[in-house]
């Protein structure tokens, strides 16, 4: 092989590596090539901004709150980030092409997947709400396993991250579900990053740690079970309602940023409260999800779960930008979420 051919092959390999590098989030360290000092880049990372996308999506006033980052430095950082991350208009055809790359993670039930048009969508927030024993946590356990499957089997070929606010996560359930899909149980457990959240501030701080982990390895799924449980205990009474909703809105915005930056499927469970009015005397109490309009607007897809006969559960699509309102029946067994056996 001639020297010219060797150089041509090296250039081709380099170009391929560059294309692979540019696919996905940019590490925040790439801002150094745009003239940002390494000490300032470290301050950004310490503040939880691990990607250039994360910097570009962050409001200017939040960047100013980072210790040691002056007004002039913020302008320079924002300018450098905007050159690497396109934030302007794009055509609908380009957006349509990008949407074709979105992955759906199977729920474990073919009937439920049919209603969801493939499964749980990556790059967005899916909310599961319902009363206790409606199947929310069991669906989350199943997704922790199915997200590790190959894409041609309905998986996401990535790891799962589980933030547990209620103490209901059980690793042995993952082992049972892994057997069903023919996966090695030890590998499945190793690929699930688990954290217990103890208060709302801790729950928010865990998202900063999540971002630093996602930049290092591929995660396909982030679960918060439940997103609202700690808000019901940390904030009490109408006097703290405004503070609770502001804190919740910021937490949900951080979840959406992770979905945008890393393309993970974000699944949150939500508790419900009985809505007692005059009609409840005749039709029984109606349940509504916690969080009000802030939760409703922050989630992309909203699914309501309720109990059926025995182990049967019903999932209803409440709101979605692309899914019609529909219902699906599924069953909870030792193997996780499965189709009903009529």
Curated annotation (Swiss-Prot):
InterPro entries: AAA+_ATPase, DNA_recomb/repair_Rad51, DNA_recomb/repair_Rad51_C, DNA_recomb/repair_RecA-like, DNA_repair_Rad51/TF_NusA_a-hlx, P-loop_NTPase, RecA_ATP-bd, RecA_monomer-monomer_interface. Its main location: nucleus. CDD domains: Rad51 (cd19513). Induction: By genotoxic stress and by DNA damage (gamma-radiation, UV-B). Regulated by ATM in response to DNA double strand breaks (DSBs). Self-associates and interacts with XRCC3. Binds to RAD54/CHR25. Interacts with BRCA2A and BRCA2B. Can form a tripartite complex with both BRCA2B and DSS1(I). The gene is RAD51. This is DNA repair protein RAD51 homolog 1. Belongs to the RecA family. RAD51 subfamily. ATP binds at residues 130-137. It comes from Arabidopsis thaliana. One of its GO terms (biological process) is DNA metabolic process. It holds the Pfam family Rad51.
């Amino acid at each position: 092989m001639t020297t010219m051919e060797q150089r041509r092959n090296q250039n081709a390999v380099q170009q391929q590596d560059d294309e692979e590098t540019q696919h996905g989030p940019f590490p925040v360290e790439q801002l150094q090539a745009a003239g940002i000092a390494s000490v300032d880049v470290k301050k950004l990372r310490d503040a939880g901004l691990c990607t250039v996308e994360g910097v570009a999506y962050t409001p200017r006033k939040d960047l100013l709150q980072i210790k040691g980052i002056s007004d002039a430095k913020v302008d320079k950082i924002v300018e450098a980030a905007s050159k690497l991350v396109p934030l302007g208009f794009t055509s609908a055809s380009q957006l349509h092409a990008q949407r074709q790359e979105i992955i759906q993670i199977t729920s474990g039930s073919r009937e439920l997947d049919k209603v969801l048009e493939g499964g749980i969508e990556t790059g967005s927030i899916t909310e599961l709400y319902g009363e206790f024993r409606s199947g929310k946590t069991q669906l989350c356990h199943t997704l922790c396993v199915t997200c590790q499957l190959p894409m041609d089997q309905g998986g996401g070929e990535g790891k799962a991250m589980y933030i547990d606010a209620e103490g209901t996560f059980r690793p042995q359930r993952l082992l049972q579900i892994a057997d069903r899909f023919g996966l090695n149980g030890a590998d499945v457990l190793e690929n699930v990053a688990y954290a217990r959240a103890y208060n709302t501030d801790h729950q928010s701080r865990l998202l900063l740690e999540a971002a630093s982990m996602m930049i290092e390895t591929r995660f396909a799924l982030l679960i918060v079970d439940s997103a609202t449980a700690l808000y019901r205990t940390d904030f009490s009474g109408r006097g703290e309602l405004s503070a609770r909703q502001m804190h919740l809105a910021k937490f949900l915005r951080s979840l959406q940023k992770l979905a945008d930056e890393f393309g993970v499927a974000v699944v949150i469970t939500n508790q419900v409260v009985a809505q007692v009015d005059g009609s409840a005397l005749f039709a029984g109490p109606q349940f509504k999800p916690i969080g009000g309009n802030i939760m409703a607007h922050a989630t992309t897809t909203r699914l309501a779960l309720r109990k059926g006969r025995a182990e049967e559960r019903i999932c209803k699509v409440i709101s979605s930008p692309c899914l019609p309102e529909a219902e699906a029946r599924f069953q909870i067994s030792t193997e996780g979420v499965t189709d009903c056996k009529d």
